[in-house]
Amino acid sequence: MKINFKAAKKLREILVQAVYQFLFNNQDTSEIYDQFVKEHQNKKIDLEILNSKLRSIELNSQKIDQAIDKTDFDISKIDLIDKAILYVAFEEIIFGELDHPVVIDEAIRLSKKFSNPDSFKFLNAIIDKYIKL
């Protein structure tokens, strides 16, 4: 299902927040999804895609961790918000249809919005290294 660029950007922002909550609270994604539906029901986002990606991240979190580990970066030392951004990016790389440059650009944008000012360099290095494997 295709969505427009602006809606896709907003969806990724909400997805990062939902994944952060999943990682922080170790909470079932169906509960997180229900909460986000209530909070964002009047916004123009595709809740079906949000649910699908959130479930994919939950079900494939070990695969995503293994993919990040292949880059020789210690997943346990990555800040939680950066880990959430990486989970969204790696889900799109491994299971999605987006071109890799788009995934990298979006991870950088999300990092600049949600994380510390220099995190985007670190995230870019991890994603770039994985893509080149």
Where are the regions that the model predicts?
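N-terminal interaction/assembly modules
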Residues: 1-113, 117-120, 124-133
